Regions:
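Mobile genetic element proteins and their domesticated derivatives, centered on retroelements
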Residues: 11, 27, 55, 69, ...
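Active-site beta-loop-alpha junctions of metal-dependent nucleic acid enzymes
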Residues: 42-49, 87-91, 142-165
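Short conserved beta-strand segments at catalytic cores or DNA/RNA-binding microdomains
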Residues: 60-63, 123-139, 148-149, 157-158
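DNA-recognition alpha helix
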Residues: 65-78
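Basic, amphipathic alpha-helical segments enriched in Lys/Arg and hydrophobic/aromatic residues
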Residues: 213-236
Length: 236
């Protein structure tokens, strides 16, 4: 453990603990005191980190509303408001999504990708959720965009290439005219592009999972919150 202020290694553990039983430390160089989760996003919260992590995991993994989660934990003797769940989700979801994306670089994907987009309403406007899976059904990448155009398609393929560290041999999509040029620009001219609605049925069915979770939320209040939520559940 190093000091959070001066980065000194001259740190001494204190005998007392925090209210949540986390260890306290004191820097002998600058005299600052801190605890073992001071550098994290949950430093000021009055609940244990493992409880908050479980709340956010259930929120992303299952079709549960904010009030559902608050009630479930209240029955178990842990009381917090549904607004606390919203705050924890906003803090932890980007961290969780980034870590899951980093770990996916180690996975080996099939050389054939299936790409499609579905519609999600954000503040009364339709946005486009780009998703790609490989031949075996493993997720390649996901991206929410306010537009369905060439720039969005290019951004999605570049993101997929950066996340996976791989380029497919073949990409199957619907007939939208932005895909051919986006594939050539982002993935290269050697990638074969197939346009077939029936071949893409497996991805159409795969949309149901994320759509079902979004349906119970009664919409999104902002594009930022929608993009944040759509990234993590797809990766779980």
């Amino acid at each position: 453990m190093r000091c959070l202020d001066c980065d000194s290694a001259a740190v001494t553990e204190r005998p007392e603990r925090t209210a949540q039983r986390y260890r306290r430390f004191r820097c002998r160089e600058c005299g600052k005191q801190f605890n073992e989760r001071s550098a994290g996003v949950l430093n000021r919260t009055q609940y244990p980190s493992d409880v908050i992590a479980l709340v956010v995991l259930w929120r992303l993994r299952y079709r549960l509303t904010l009030r559902d989660l608050a009630e479930m934990f209240f029955i178990r003797g842990i009381a917090f408001s549904y607004e606390a769940v919203r705050e924890w989700e906003a803090k932890l979801t980007p961290i969780l999504a980034d870590e899951l994306r980093r770990r996916r670089r180690r996975r080996r994907l099939a050389p054939s990708w299936y790409v499609d987009e579905t519609y999600i309403k954000v503040r009364g406007r339709w946005c486009y959720l780009y998703r790609a899976i490989d031949r075996n059904g493993a997720l390649v990448d996901v991206m929410l965009s306010e537009r369905r155009d060439l720039a969005a398609a290019k951004a999605f393929f570049r993101s997929a290439k950066a996340v996976t560290g791989a380029v497919p041999d073949r990409v199957t999509s619907d007939g939208h005219d932005s895909y051919p040029q986006a594939i050539r620009s982002a993935l290269g001219k050697t990638v074969t592009h197939r346009t077939n609605v029936y071949l893409n049925n497996r991805l159409e069915q795969d949309h149901r999972g994320i759509k079902g979770r979004i349906r119970c939320m009664r919409g999104f209040g902002s594009f930022v919150s929608a993009r944040r939520f759509c990234r993590a559940p797809a990766l779980l």
